Each structure stands twice: as structure tokens, then as C-alpha cells.
Amino acid sequence: MMYIIYITITEAHMLYLADDKKTNYVIVYRKDHTDSEKTAAEELATYLEKITGANFPVVTDDASAEKHEIVVGFCDRPGCKAQKKLGDDGYTIKVSGERLLILGSAVRGALYGVYTFLEKYCGCRFFTKDFEKVPTVERTLYVDSNIDLTEIPVFEYRNVYWYSFMNDEMICAKQKINGGMGHPITDKIGGGVHYNGGFCHTIPELAETGNIWDMPCLMDEDIYQTTLKNVRAKLRAEPDKKIISISQVDGNNGECSCDKCRAVFEEEGSHIGTLIRFINRIKEDIRDEFPDVVLDTLAYQYTRKPPEKTKPHDGMIVRLCNVESCFRHPIENVCHEVDPAFGSFPENLRKWSKICKRLYIWDYTTNFTNMSTIFPNLMALRPNMKLYADTGVVGVFSQGNSTDFNGELGELRAYLLAKLQWNPYMGEAEYRLHMQEFCENYYGEGGKYILRYIDMIHDCSEDSHMNMYFDNSANIISMKGYKDHLTGCFAFYDKASELFDKAEAETWGAKNKSAYTNVRRSRISLHNYYNFVLKSAKENFENEEDKLMIERAIVENNREHFILMRECDVKENREFHRLDFSEVPDFTTYPMQW
């Protein structure tokens, strides 16, 4: 669980950290510090100077103690002894006399505590790797002596796999992302959770089959011995990486169908039976040499259903993938057809949680077929993350558009996911506040219209369902109260266009120069939507003159769509496909075909 503890002290007073660009405070951290502790102290000094204009000296704890200190991390000061309960990532922020204490581990806790202090008590916001808000005080920065906050994360592993957090370790620290996949997390920010070798679909390499689409027979002794040999080799080559994935091939029809494998499938009631037994055996065989290594696998598509007899080894992570779910609504609603052979995702989740000590979730948070189309899943993210926490999940990997800017609301989605991964129990009001703060800063004066647009896309898709692979958003979003779906689509487009027009007008020439571009970039998804509305209209019209008019509208919309993508540097319109802006596409075709 996450524990957030507030302790009220009766007679409060203020700690005046800076006044008129001067300070009496020094920042203190451990002499025998880690890189992360040093980063924490230096980052605090840097941001406090930006906020107040005052220079905060930074010293180690072998210096003489002073009355006015900001203590960062566990060190040689009263009340600053290490607390095991905080783990690697937890922290306590409190006041003791005239001292401000930001206490946390030498791994990441002290650093995370610093960024939380800057957010909660100084008004900083870390929205993306390129955009943050750092307020300035005209004269005095003070904090209430009643401060006493402890936070310990629910999830030991947190990874938001979106472009706005990629390839920048500092935004990872600011958003408390510790998953190393896609993020260059070094000792500077306390390191992270890194996998040894591949992150997923690793069995073809480990078993040396050379076949990425077909699963090898896991009852074959040669396959086992080859895999065991390669697991040992990888662990010896990179002994600092303590997790290695032994996971199935991608796709939905890769399992072996030999008699031995089929017998295990029937005995276990699941196709993951052979895989769990295979990995359990490897764990036992490497236990003496690598006692602290954790083996990892996927429960994905045909292996999603848990086995009925064999439990995963205590030293195993199972990453359960919610690939088949409807993402418009909370996953627990189960608003799609369920194959009785595999069961529903919530059912699988609860059963896995009973037999697996370290259960992770692979969470899909974009439309991989059309990454710049409207994807109204923002209202489902919070209940989904709470479901994972309630069910005992200890790690979440939220996969999105990781390779490029998102022509929709990807930057907002990534920010919200990071907040939820740290605190999956936040209430609706807090969640809405995070959304509002992001929009009002990232989109500037246009943010109020983007917020109305967000509400509208969710209202207009309330009765629809969507998976992670769909190309036609016009099938999902339509304004209610019109004679037919298509008429409602045109009405939605007109209203949404009006909101974006106002947002652009409010941000053109604004001091926040990036706001206009951010509004324009998010508008790409509306152009994408309109393309499918026009396509549907063309299919419904019988009159050739009307069809010709629609064809001209399609060409004009596609031309504007392409210009906007080039202007905002959005190259990837679907997974594994990037546009070449030096070549002008055929505007009579759909963007998915460019």
C-alpha cells in the first residue's frame, strides 16, 4: 500500500527559507554520498535559486551543524537516521525545529523527496522532458512547520513508455519512473530496474531457434539446456542486472502442439503451463550461482489464463498483458466478448494475484494502428490503476507511443500515468486537478478549450468500445441527439473544430511560445477523425456529384493533415511506420496508407 501520513502540530510557525533573494539556510547531505544523493542536493539548490533568486550553499554532513539547514537524505544530523520502512523509493518530508528534513534512501528516496517538496510546497510542475513550470517568488519563500509527509509507493516497478519521457533520465526522476526499458536511468538518479537482455519475446534468442513467430517445444530437453546455457551466460556477462525475461514469441498462435505439450495444457487448464514449469526448473538450476536473480515472463494472449496446478516460483515475475480489453471504459467492466477458454482479464488478474508473489501489468495506453487518432481513455486510467493496486500488482509498464511526438493527447496521458503509477489511490478530484494543471500550462490560454474538448470526446464515446487496434475513430465518437451516427459525427467535428480554433487564437503570439504548437499538434487527431467521417459519408452518398464533393474535401483535409504533421514534427502515424516529409503523399489515399 501507499501510506500518506499527515501529523498536525498545534502551535505552527513558518520556516522562512529565503527572503529578498537571500537565505540563512544551507543544504546538507551525506559525506559518503551516492551519486543520487548528490544529485538530490544539487537539484534542490538549483531549483530553490530559480524560485527565490537566493544562493543556497550545499555542504556535506561533516561540516559543523547550523541552526538553519535543509537536510537531504539520511545523514549525521538529529532525527535523520535511516528508515528501512521507506525502502528504495519512499521518503519523509518534515520540519524539526528550524530544520527542514527531506529523508529518503541513498538509492532514489532522497531524490524523489526533493522533487516532491518542489512540487507540493514550492509549486513546481514537471510536465514533459521539455516543459516544466518553475514559479518565482517576489520576496519570501516559506513553508509551514506542520509539514509531515511520508509516501511509500505501491508499485516497486513504474514505467511510462511514452515519448515525452523517453531518453531523458531527469524527467524519469522527477516523475518517479524507475523502469529502465526505454529510459537511460543511470546512477546519477539512483539507477533503475533494468532487464538483462531483451525485455520481451526472448525465447527465440535464448533457445537459439531463429524463429520469432513459432514457440519452441518447451518439453524438448535440447531446448531447455540451450536456454539454460544462455541464461547463465547473460547473467555472468551483466551481473548487475538482476531480472531476465524468458518470454514467449509475439503473436497469438505460436504454442507447440506436440503430445507432451498438449498433455500439460490439459492438466494445467492453460497454455502457460509448460512455460511456468520450464522457468521454475531454470530458477532451481541457477539458484546456487544466482540466488538473487528474478526470472520474468509474459502472460500474454493465449497464455493469459493462469495455470491450475503449478505456481510460479517465488523468484519469478509474471507480466500480465491486458491486450484484449476495451480501453474506453474501466477494465473491470468487461464490456467486450469474452472467450470462455481464456476468461476475462479481471478474472485472470485476480487468479494470478493468488498464486504469483510478484505480479506486473503490461498496460496498453494508445491505439497502435493509428497513433494520431482520438483515443478517449483518460477516464479509464484511474480506475484501472486502482484495480491493479487493489489486486496486489507490484509493477506497471504503460506502453504508448514511445518513438515520436503524439498528434493527440499523448503528453497529457503520459503525465497522468506517471502520477497514477506513484499514487494509484488518488481520488477523482486530485486526478482532475492534475489534468487541469497540465492543460492550463502546456496549452497556455488554450488549455480551457482543450479541457472542454477532452470532456466532449469522452461524452461522445460513452456508449462505444475500443481496443488497442482500430483505424476508424468515427465509429467510436459521435455527438448524441442527432438523427443518425454520421450526422452526429459531423456535429462533433464542427464543435471540436470550434474549440481548437479558439485555443489556437488564444495561444497565437503568446508568451508561452510552445503552447500554440502544442495545441496544433493535438489537433492532428481531429483531422484524422474527420478523414474517417468523410470516408463514411462518401460510402453513404449515392449521387455522383455529392461523392465528388466529398472526394475534394478528403484531399483538402489530407493536405492540411500532412502540413500539420510536418509543422509539428509528428512522423509516426502507426506502429513501426514513420513518414518521410521530403515526399508528398497521394492525398486521395488515407493517411494510414502514406
Features from the language model and the residues they span:
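Disordered inhibitory propeptide/activation segment of secreted metzincin zinc metalloprotease zymogens
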Residues: E11-N24
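Feature activates predominantly on carbohydrate-active enzymes
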Residues: T23-N24, V28, D32, S36-E43, ...
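Short, well-ordered secondary-structure micro-motifs within conserved domains or adaptor modules
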Residues: P57-K84
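Structured mid-domain segments that build the active-site/substrate or prosthetic-cofactor binding neighborhood
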Residues: L218-Q225, A233, E337-E445
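Active-site-proximal loop/turn and secondary-structure-junction residues that shape catalytic pockets
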Residues: D250-N252, A299-T303, N322-E324, T365-N367, ...
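Acidic, His- and aromatic-enriched active-site or binding-groove loops in soluble protein domains
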Residues: F265-I279, H313-E332, L420-Y425
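Substrate-binding cleft/loops of secretory-pathway carbohydrate-active enzymes
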Residues: A299-F327, T373-M379, G407-R413
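Catalytic domains of carbohydrate-active enzymes that cleave complex glycans
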Residues: L420-W594
